[in-house]
Amino acid sequence: MSISAVVFDRDGVLTSFDWTRAEEDVRRITGLPLEEIERRWGGWLNGLTIDDAFVETQPISEFLSSLARELELGSKARDELVRLDYMAFAQGYPDARPALEEARRRGLKVGVLTNNSLLVSARSLLQCAALHDLVDVVLSSQMIGAAKPDPRAYQAIAEALGVSTTSCLFFDDIADWVEGARCAGMRAYLVDRSGQTRDGVVRDLSSLGAILDGAGP
């Protein structure tokens, strides 16, 4: 079947995140490691309704304010936590926007499927990385209620794009999630930015055009 849509993982494929800087700032303000903040963020998201999570009507400031109360932070630390700009830790890879533009130029739907929604909404980080205008649908595992490599995650993004899984081309930097996409019927590639191109593996997204032409890895 011909390709009708291209689906990308977000972190590690389209965007990178400076975890060291984020860890330093979060620990400095809260005294907690980033992993603990992530755990609490996941619990807070689970308390939202599906509609709230999907349209992202609950701003992150609500979570941070709630966290500050739980930790009994002083007013200065609370204000600093709420004002902390997590978007400043994120950026798009140089090959990301050209790949999205190539998909759009060919008339393909573009989706993003992420298991991560750490301290930022699924779409907001793409907006910070100047990629959001080229993406049709963004879904996170919290929105779906299933995470990669669960087949339901891949089915959800395909349905949201209005296509079948078998007409999707998929890119991820986690091997198990790539295999999950293949099991769901997608044509999938592992993005290994530190390794060498080999069968089913690409170094970055610059090979998207060649793959769509049938000449890629």
UniProtKB/Swiss-Prot annotation:
A GO molecular function assigned to this protein is: hydrolase activity
Source domain of life: Bacteria
- Residues annotated as the enzyme's active site: D9 (nucleophile)
Task: Specify whether Membrane is a keyword of the entry.
Answer: no
Is the keyword Transit peptide assigned to this protein?
A: no
Q: What is its EC number?
A: 3.1.-.-
| Enzymatic class | hydrolase
Keywords per UniProt: Hydrolase
Q: What does this protein do?
A: Able to hydrolyze geranyl diphosphate (GPP), farnesyl diphosphate (FPP) and geranylgeranyl diphosphate (GGPP) to respectively yield geraniol, farnesol and geranylgeraniol.
Q: Which family does it belong to?
A: Belongs to the HAD-like hydrolase superfamily.
- The protein depicted here goes by the name Phosphatase MT3486
> What is the taxonomic lineage of the source species?
Bacteria, Bacillati, Actinomycetota, Actinomycetes, Mycobacteriales
